[in-house]
């Protein structure tokens, strides 16, 4: 039992470091909405590329949901499901009162949601930039095992 507790703790540490690295790597250049991105809402427009990076490091699947904002507008949103649990590191981009459904995979003819997201060249570019920044940040934290 002690071995599984140690593994869980290591996984929790990795997730903490990854979340810290992501939040410190988000910029206007990694956002899908550069015009409305601000340092006050750094998660804005980061959901697809963040879900891809989380998938790289933690596995699981990428999920899509049509988020309903308090004013009734619907916004496309991606997050992760890992070991049956929702992991949404960009939920904070939405105002209080936004409703994010449980979501589904979004493939649109591709074999996975990941492949669908990466079929967009601009998203691919933003993903590569974010992943590079995250890798550099993790190295600064002394994380060499990933």
Residue ranges and their predicted role:
Residues 1-146:
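A structural boundary/capping signal
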